[in-house]
Amino acid sequence: MNSDAMTRQPQLASSAIIERDGRYLLVRRANPPSADMYAFPGGRAEPGETPAETALRELAEETGICGREPVLFETYDLVPNHAESRHFLLSVFRVEADSDCDAVASDDAADAGWFTPEEIFALPIPESVRHCVEKLARMRPSIHPSRDALASGTDSDLMDP
């Protein structure tokens, strides 16, 4: 990395995570820096915008979905790995949206869709998306009883009344 890339001011960016029935909304990027990769809807901040405002604006621009109640989920310092890259400070928010809103790709999103974590891991995704989905999966309560409880027969929910 050259010294010019090191001294440039980082750009602020935000993205929005929306979960619906165990699926997460992703867009396929049409433009660099992540062209043809899948990511949460998001992008660069405009002057005077808070990170939460950026996440909601980018969500609406890229998918047509109006989000609300953004809650900071994770932050990333995305340092460039070559001279042409830009340094970003990325804020990722969990966002609420009406369940009947359809995602329609627009702006710099070439496509939009809802994906399970397993499907996401098979797609070309930035490391930040992989990390967020792994963290979300760890936070999500299991819908299956543990194998240990099944083997030992100690889980009271498994016993007949």
Residue positions per predicted region:
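Conserved Nudix-box catalytic region and its N-terminal flanking loop in Nudix hydrolases
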Residues: R23-E61, P161
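Nudix hydrolase/Nudix homology domain
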Residues: P33-Y38, D102-P161
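A short coil-to-beta-strand element that immediately follows conserved catalytic motifs
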Residues: C66-T75
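Conserved N-terminal beta-strand and adjoining loop/helix that marks the start
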Residues: N2-L25
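Active-site-adjacent beta-strand/loop module that shapes the phosphate/pyrophosphate-binding cleft
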Residues: Y76-D102, K135-L136
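A generic structural micro-feature
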Residues: M6-P10, M37, A83-L89, S106-A109
